[in-house]
A protein has these predicted regions:
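Short, compositionally biased low-complexity segments
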Residues: 1-3, 61-64, 101-115, 186-198
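Acidic low-complexity segments
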Residues: 2-23, 29-43, 83-173, 205-213
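Broad gene-expression machinery/nucleic-acid interaction feature
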Residues: 31, 43, 59-63, 72, ...
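Generic structural motif
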Residues: 39, 69, 80, 157-159, ...
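N-terminal alpha-helical targeting/anchoring segments
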Residues: 42-97
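Short beta-strand elements
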Residues: 55-68, 171-200
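Short, solvent-exposed aromatic-acidic interface loops
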Residues: 78-80, 197-205
Length: 216
């Protein structure tokens, strides 16, 4: 099942209508596109033996760009609707009204997939992630009374992007991103030292957790 966002699913504008607005806006331009982005992120922080923070954010929006000769016009909105697209279209046309160009459909392009089509945020439940953080905290504190402070956190993100060019040509991508960090402070005879470990990248949490827990 694809995790690519359907940017028009909850909008009053259909994909066909959006493509029509894009083609109409760019017909006298050299180049341009509608760039759609849906970003979801989470952060879970354990500190001082308890979960100090847990947050989730979701952002949706678009950028509309038109290029004619040496002039670049750009408009953006965090609302994907018929009105916002039409307003952006009018803004671009107004900026480029005295400049004429010819849309280039032959610009080299690629839609190569670099990352797995996954949403790391949904691969584990919130309770599972909290349990892992608590287990890490318990394990490190079990190493002795010298361990005075343990901080551990998860950071996860999934970003879906789609680019629509004149004529309905579409390029899309899904970009996962995760991070797992641990910080430990130890104290002996009044001397404090801190060690930090972190790992992450554009894969799932599980891709890093097994290796991380072995190192810890």
């Amino acid at each position: 099942m694809s995790l690519m966002s359907n940017f028009f699913e909850k909008s009053d504008v259909s994909r066909k209508e959006a493509e029509s607005i894009i083609s109409d806006t760019l017909q006298k331009c050299d180049d341009g596109e509608l760039y759609l982005e849906n970003s979801k992120s989470e952060s879970i922080l354990l500190d001082d033996n308890k979960i100090k923070n847990s947050s989730y954010n979701s952002d949706l929006g678009f950028g509309f760009r038109a290029i004619s000769d040496e002039v670049v016009a750009y408009s953006h909105s965090n609302e994907i609707s018929k009105n916002s697209l039409k307003q952006s279209s009018e803004n671009l046309k107004s900026t480029l009204k005295s400049v004429k160009g010819t849309y280039n459909h032959e610009i080299p392009k690629s839609n190569k997939k670099y990352y797995d089509n996954i949403n790391p945020i949904e691969q584990k439940s919130l309770n599972e992630k909290i349990k892992i953080l608590n287990d890490v905290n318990d394990y490190l504190r079990s190493k002795g009374d010298k361990v005075k402070q343990v901080t551990a956190n998860f950071l996860g993100e999934q970003k879906s992007v789609e680019i629509i060019r004149s004529g309905g040509e579409t390029l899309s991508d899904v970009r996962p991103l995760v991070r797992f960090n641990v910080s430990v402070m130890v104290e002996k005879d009044g001397r404090k030292e801190t060690g930090v470990y972190g790992v992450g990248g554009r894969q799932s949490y599980d891709s890093y957790l097994k290796l991380s827990l072995i190192h810890i």
